[in-house]
């Protein structure tokens, strides 16, 4: 039976054969007639398929729109977060390296009844404040836990010793004295809490922070916006709004009444500028003595002398009284040794210009005694005066110890010839002294004068010293004619010599005089 053209178009043969023929021609055109045939032949399927496609498209549109809104919201949130980060207040701990060194060992803070300052002190740098707003910067110290600790020496560490109750102590906070201040001023400076004091006196009325000994605490920093309705100086607690709190792990410490860890003690002495006295070598005599023995000194100084006369009875071994111009006994009477035959020189430290600092010898209390007597002429006897407190006639500074020296009673400017009775280079009255009977004690005073033993006439004798020096030793040269005269006098059994006004010229002195400490 023949089919009409319209019926043949919708026949199975046409449907199966026509796509195969057109497959080679145009694959893109294949779907369009197929879809049309499906739409016309299967109406039920077309009705079912069309709503599903329509439903898929709105879903895709909704997803695209939702994704756009998500991206826009995320962009807005990121921008808000960036703005918040710029406006968020940040606090940076200053001196964190030093705090970490203490924290690694175990920081300890001394607390006393009167109050003790912290070292290291809390110092911070603030960022992110509103330059126009007013802020309070406050410090308080809170317990780390509710434990009480004890220090174990054999293991050098802190151990828990029991529980404790901190509710019995009213918490206190320290308001920085610059508060309130604008954010611009706070951000421009380093905020230091070096005036904070810690105390264990629960009845303290000076505003110190009250803590308990052998407990662990951690300081906190609070940045509070100023509120005209609240006066922080009159309240005992923080407001609930507008407060930013900061704390640092390395600032934790244990309260003690005396340092337990020796490493903490050494570190605080080394780094604390107020512990200078503990670093002073004068506190350790052994360290100072070792330093003095090894440190080379090359000082050059000049000396002026002032004379005192001692009268000794020939052949007697008693004490040698010291007399003044009026014949009254001198206050040095009880200080002289019975057999002090050579003259001596007392040198206060202020009279010669040492080049080394006074601090090196300020704690040495032993006076120095130097004998500068020629051993081939006179027998040298030790003679040491006590500390300056027993010499009221001398004004002696306390920075350096006294110095005693023995010198021969000779002069290069005036010497009496015992045979002729004449003297050489002598102008004016002369000082005469006997080797066996008289001794002369020279006390160095301000540049000026020495007393004549008989008439108490004032003379000035200057002894410039330019020797090769060492610690505790001095080499002093002497004119050759003085040695010749001294030896000549000793051979003839007389020692009448004179001093006149003038000074000794050291440029022609070459033999050395023995000296000892």
Swiss-Prot record:
Keyword Transmembrane helix: no
Annotated GO MF terms: DNA-binding transcription factor activity; RNA polymerase II cis-regulatory region sequence-specific DNA binding
PANTHER family according to UniProt: T-BOX PROTEIN-RELATED, T-BOX TRANSCRIPTION FACTOR TBX22
Main location: nucleus
Entry keywords, A to Z: DNA-binding, Nucleus, Transcription, Transcription regulation
Organism taxonomic ancestry: Eukaryota, Metazoa, Chordata, Craniata, Vertebrata
Name recorded for this polypeptide: T-box transcription factor TBX22
GO BP term, example: positive regulation of DNA-templated transcription
Residue segments, region Disordered: 1-83, 312-333
UniProt KW Transcription regulation keyword: yes
Feature: compositional bias, Acidic residues: 35-45
Cellular compartments annotated: Nucleus
Basic and acidic residues compositional bias, start-end: 46-66
DNA-binding region: 93-280
Biased composition (Low complexity): 74-83, 314-333
PROSITE patterns referenced in this protein's UniProt entry, alphabetically: TBOX_1, TBOX_2, TBOX_3
InterPro entries: p53-like_TF_DNA-bd_sf, T-box_DNA-bd, T-box_sf, TF_T-box, TF_T-box_CS
Top-rank lineage group of the source organism: Eukaryota
Cellular component GO terms, alphabetical: nucleus
